[in-house]
């Protein structure tokens, strides 16, 4: 039985005081136990404070991106070594906004995924198709290729620990949501692709999230699907009560 993983991706939102208030609201009320994992994916300047506030709780703190090198002349970048030193446990990689706005490629996402494992960080690897690709019936090919390239060169054990987030680009921040059946169909395909490049046993262990306009009103239906093990949530994760409702849904 795979546990549910609910990750809130704040993107470029909040200031430090607001981030602290959020954690003050969430940490004491977050469900305890092994049924669900709550992860807050925050901007770099907040990570140290949030890790401190989450100490002693089961709330995890993630970065939204990182460089693949440990150090060097990469002005403006943050390394996996820095994140690990802060106490961060997870890192979001290859989000569609990074791919589209910052030209991140499958090859780059793979380098970052390997770097995450080299420093004992759990990668949340994002994959997903655009509206044009979906309408051209390219969804499975596009997403399958993104998955294959992201996990290329990883050990089976590392693949089993990778969290894959399926985020159809056309459903992010648009208010449009893939139906639970559409979402599950792609998540099932992702598991099949993982099985092809590793084994059925490994594929059964991989946690696959859905992301794209997830909110308390639709999360139950999404999490009830056979191959959806959690959610990567944007806007609805910015409010502590909304985020707690989403996490609570993972315990059902």
Swiss-Prot record:
One Gene Ontology CC term in the entry: cytosol
UniProt entry keywords in alphabetical sequence: Cytoplasm, Gluconeogenesis, Glycolysis, Isomerase, Phosphoprotein
A Pfam family it matches: TIM
GO MF entry, a single one: triose-phosphate isomerase activity
Domain of life assignment: Bacteria
Gene Ontology annotations of biological process type: gluconeogenesis; glyceraldehyde-3-phosphate biosynthetic process; glycerol catabolic process; glycolytic process
E.C. number: 5.3.1.1
Main location group: cytoplasm
Enzyme active site: 95 (electrophile), 167 (proton acceptor)
Catalytic reaction equation(s): D-glyceraldehyde 3-phosphate = dihydroxyacetone phosphate
Transmembrane residue ranges: none
Pathways involved: Carbohydrate biosynthesis; gluconeogenesis; Carbohydrate degradation; glycolysis; D-glyceraldehyde 3-phosphate from glycerone phosphate: step 1/1
EC category: isomerase
Places the protein is found: Cytoplasm
Residues noted as binding substrate in the record, renumbered to the chain: 9-11, 173, 213, 234-235
InterPro entries: Aldolase_TIM (IPR013785), TIM_sf (IPR035990), TrioseP_Isoase_bac/euk (IPR022896), Triosephosphate_isomerase (IPR000652), Triosephosphate_isomerase_AS (IPR020861)
Positions carrying Phosphoserine: 213
Subunit structure comment from the entry: Homodimer.
Protein family per UniProt: Belongs to the triosephosphate isomerase family.
Functional note: Involved in the gluconeogenesis. Catalyzes stereospecifically the conversion of dihydroxyacetone phosphate (DHAP) to D-glyceraldehyde-3-phosphate (G3P).
Name by which UniProt lists this protein: Triosephosphate isomerase
Organism: Oceanobacillus iheyensis (strain DSM 14371 / CIP 107618 / JCM 11309 / KCTC 3954 / HTE831)
Higher taxonomy: Bacteria, Bacillati, Bacillota, Bacilli, Bacillales
